């Protein structure tokens, strides 16, 4: 898979990132390099490899699983410009 200039402009528009026309070829090269690396990762044989959380074996510390409301919902949204029922209200960014 490769990315063309039209796709670069579309991704930039969706991400709300300004990309100058002069920078489009550079961004296109970078995105294609990233996709090539991901394709390399897809070709790695991981059959029989156990899932891991870290490269170094470390014991996972556990805490007691207690459900709480946290008691700080008001403090969390106190500085937000817009909230509704303890939720942040944000503008729509995906069309």
From Swiss-Prot:
It is an enzyme of class 6 (ligase). InterPro entries: Asp/Glu-ADT_sf_sub_c (IPR036113), GatC (IPR003837). It catalyses: L-glutamyl-tRNA(Gln) + L-glutamine + ATP + H2O = L-glutaminyl-tRNA(Gln) + L-glutamate + ADP + phosphate + H(+); L-aspartyl-tRNA(Asn) + L-glutamine + ATP + H2O = L-asparaginyl-tRNA(Asn) + L-glutamate + ADP + phosphate + 2 H(+). Keywords: ATP-binding, Ligase, Nucleotide-binding, Protein biosynthesis. It holds the Pfam family GatC. Its EC number is 6.3.5.-. Allows the formation of correctly charged Asn-tRNA(Asn) or Gln-tRNA(Gln) through the transamidation of misacylated Asp-tRNA(Asn) or Glu-tRNA(Gln) in organisms which lack either or both of asparaginyl-tRNA or glutaminyl-tRNA synthetases. The reaction takes place in the presence of glutamine and ATP through an activated phospho-Asp-tRNA(Asn) or phospho-Glu-tRNA(Gln). HAMAP family: GatC. Belongs to the GatC family. This is Aspartyl/glutamyl-tRNA(Asn/Gln) amidotransferase subunit C. It comes from Beijerinckia indica subsp. indica (strain ATCC 9039 / DSM 1715 / NCIMB 8712).
């Amino acid at each position: 898979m490769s990315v063309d200039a039209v796709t670069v402009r579309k991704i930039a528009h969706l991400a709300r990132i300004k990309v100058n026309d002069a920078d489009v070829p550079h961004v296109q090269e970078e995105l294609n390099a990233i996709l090539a690396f991901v394709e390399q990762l897809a070709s790695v044989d991981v059959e029989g490899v156990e899932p891991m959380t870290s490269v170094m074996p470390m014991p996972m510390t556990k805490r007691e699983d207690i459900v709480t409301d946290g008691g700080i919902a008001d403090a969390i949204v106190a500085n937000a410009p817009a909230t509704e029922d303890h939720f942040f209200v944000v503008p729509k960014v995906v069309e």
